[in-house]
Regions:
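Cytosolic regulatory modules rich in charged/polar residues
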Residues: 1-189, 301-310
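Conserved, well-folded catalytic cores of nucleic-acid-processing
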Residues: 19-23, 60-67, 104, 108, ...
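Transmembrane alpha-helical segments that form the functional core of multipass membrane systems
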Residues: 119, 125-270
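Hydrophobic alpha-helical transmembrane segments of membrane transport and translocation systems
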Residues: 238-310
Length: 310
């Protein structure tokens, strides 16, 4: 069997205490919800935690006025940090692994455990934390760095590959000329990309609602059959299908599901702006994404692009 958090908060605190048997590990119990009165544990290392962040977290939890925590830690997260409805980037990182939670504690972060939830909430969180995978630390240093760099490159390609291609389909290095569009399709490229984005989400939702024994065969068969007939019918270019297949697979390299959709929305904005204003729209889209990340703040008010702990 493998160690992991469960729905009982007492067991979860014990799993963390087994790994850190130090007097500086503090677990403060409180509760939220006027009706549910759900137990909450605020865990931190007293000699490493950012005191300002800790005070901020405590004050936010104490000032909560909600009836219950219907969705456990997700309800708590939304109540603690009410972000704008148009902001898709996650402000909290969740993990079901005690080793990951303990590693974050030793880095000076705050862990919040909610009763009836098998996940731990990690604060503060930056975009770099979202694309980081816990398994990277179980490999040698060179391998771990390679996986991190590869994931970062794939993340960038996921956002910019299709908009760059849409901006100038003929602008391809000689060694990659085999990827150039040769089929004459009446459907504009931008519509092809947007339709395929919707189709990929449709296949993903279908796989989620399909019995587990059939989900994988259904995804493979549906993707192959629909892709083949979509190209043969003249609706899509085969090259466009290739790029969108890469994007679809690259989305699964994101450890955080919510971050994958945030990157998807940024890619859609870039696609639309590039289609309307060409290279000017692409530059405006890049500037918009950059400003969005720069002015996006974490729970402690720090920059979302990076976090420096005490």
């Amino acid at each position: 069997s493998r160690d992991g958090f469960v729905e009982t908060i007492v067991f979860n605190t014990a799993l963390m205490r087994r790994r850190i048997r130090d007097e500086h590990l503090i677990m403060e119990m409180t509760e939220a919800g006027q009706t549910s009165r759900t137990d909450i544990a605020i865990c931190y290392m007293s000699d490493r935690v950012d005191k300002e962040l800790l005070a901020n977290v405590k004050s936010r939890i104490e000032s909560l006025h909600i009836d219950d925590l219907k969705m456990n830690q997700q309800t708590l997260a939304e109540a603690m940090f009410k972000r704008k409805w148009f902001n898709p980037f996650p402000k909290f990182k969740f993990t079901e692994r005690p080793d990951t939670a303990v590693a974050c504690l030793l880095e000076g972060k705050v862990i919040i455990l909610v009763d009836n939830s098998p996940s731990a909430m990690i604060l503060p969180t930056s975009i770099l934390d979202m694309i980081e995978e816990a398994n990277d630390y179980y490999f040698p240093t060179v391998t771990g760095m390679y996986l991190k760099v590869s994931r970062a490159i794939i993340t960038i390609l996921t956002v910019f590959m299709t908009p760059v291609y849409l901006m100038n389909p003929s602008w391809i290095p000689s060694m990659f000329e085999f990827t150039a569009v040769r089929d004459v399709i009446n459907v504009p490229l931008v519509l092809q990309f947007l339709i395929l984005e919707l189709c990929i989400d449709g296949l993903r939702l279908a796989a989620l609602n399909t019995p587990s024994m059939l989900s994988t065969p259904l995804s493979v068969i549906a993707g192959l059959v629909l892709g083949e007939f979509a190209v043969q019918s003249g609706w899509f270019n085969s090259e466009v299908m290739l790029y969108m297949a890469f994007v679809a697979v690259a989305n699964y390299t994101q450890p955080n599901f919510e971050m994958g959709y945030a990157l998807k929305f940024m890619r859609l904005i870039l696609l639309v702006l590039t289609a309307v204003l060409d290279w000017i729209g692409f530059l405006l889209g890049c500037l918009f994404i950059l400003c969005f990340l720069i002015f996006n703040k974490t729970l402690s008010g720090r920059n979302y692009l990076n976090i420096k702990l005490n």
